[in-house]
Amino acid sequence: MKLRICELVINKTLITKTKIETILETKKKAIQNYAYILHDKDIYQNEKEAQLNGKKVGDIKAPHWHIYLRFNYSQDTKHISQWFNTQENFVSKIKGRFSDALMYMIHANRLDKHQYDEKEVVSNFDWKSEAQQDIFNRKYKMDARLKDILLKIHSGEIKEYNINDNINILENNIYATAIEKAFKFRIRDLKKKVRQMECIFITGLSGSGKSTLAKKIAEDKNYEAYISSGSNDILDDYCGEECIILDDLRSNCLGLSDLLKMLDNNTASSVKSRYKNKVLECQLIIITTVKSIDDFFEDIFRKDESIIQLKRRCKLHIKIDSKYIYYSVWNPIEMKYDLIEKKPNNLLNDFQIKSLSKKEAKDYIKSISNIDLDKDC
C-alpha cells in the first residue's frame, strides 16, 4: 500500500531518538515533513485493552513513539517499515485529516488523555500553526459563492428587496441562516454611520401628479423606491430600498418621535414598526400629501412644539397644482421656504396619463373579462 502521509507507532525499547533522527536525515529527499513525540504518560482507560496487556485501568502504558510523516510523493508501507526496522502493520494510514493527527501528538483533541507539552514535539515545520489553521478553516469553511453573497450584503449591493435577484432557491435554502446573520451585521454597522439622506415634501390636490413626480425623482436618481403601505405601520414591508416614498401620508400614522428619527440625517436611527424596528438606510425620503406643510405638521405637533426642526429637514418643498409645479428651498437664516422656480406641470403628458376612449375602454373590458360589449346579448 502506498501512502502520502502516515503514522508509525513504535515501542521505545525498539528504537531510540537518535536512530529516528538518523533515519529522517537519511530519507530527507523523500520526506517533506515530519513530527514525532514520545508518549510515556499514557494510561489504560479501557478495561478490555488493559486486560489484553495484563494491566489494569489506570496503569501506565509502555512508552512509545508517535511518528507522523508527509512525503513528497507516495511511499510503499513496506519500504517505510524497513526504514524504521519495524513490522509493516505498525505503519498505518492516517484516518481523517493530517491536522487532527498532529493535534493528537499532544492530545489537544483528546482532553480525557494526558496533555503533553508541545515543546516535546520534534518537527521540521510549524505543525501547530498548520493544524490550527486547518481546523479553523474547516470550522468556518465557506465556499466562494457564500463568501461572494456575504460580501455583497455587507457592501449594500445585495439588500432584502433584491435578494431574490441575486440568489436562487437552492442557495436560499442552504445559506438562509448565514444570509440572515449578514443582514443583521449590516444593520449594526449602519447604526454607527452618519446617514447622508435628503427629504422632499410634495403637496398638492389629488390627481395633480404628486405620486408620479415622487416616482420620477426616484427613477431619475436610479434609486429603488419603497412606497409606504396604507396601514398604520407604514414601514411594514420596507426592505432597505434607497428611496422611501411616504405616499399620501396621514399625520396620524406617525408620532413626533418617529417622524424626527425618520428624517434625521445624522444617524441611521431605528423607527418604530409594528413588528420590528426598521433601520432606515435610504438616501432619499419623499413625503406626498394633500395638506400644506404647515397644516400637516401642526396635526402632528403639540401646541408647545415647533415645526421648524422638521421644515429644516425637509429642505426641498414642492407644491403642485393642475398647471404649475413650484420648487422652494428652506432658508435657514430667514426660517422660511424661498421660491426658486415655477415650472409648467407636464407630468400627465410626460407619463402619457390620459383617459381611455370609448373604443379603448371596450377593448380593455374585453381583454380582462372576455365580455364583448359590441355583441348583442
From Swiss-Prot:
KW Ion transport (keyword) present: no
Leader peptide range in chain numbering: none
InterPro entries, A to Z: Helicase_SF3_ssDNA/RNA_vir, P-loop_NTPase, Plasmid_rep_OBD
GO molecular function: ATP binding; DNA binding; DNA topoisomerase activity; RNA binding; RNA helicase activity
Keywords: ATP-binding, DNA replication, Nucleotide-binding, Plasmid
Residues annotated to bind ATP: 204-211
Pfam family, one: Rep_OBD
Assigned protein family: Belongs to the Gram-positive plasmids replication protein type 2 family.
Role of this protein: Is essential for plasmid replication. Nicks the positive strand at the plus origin of replication.
Protein name as annotated: Replication protein
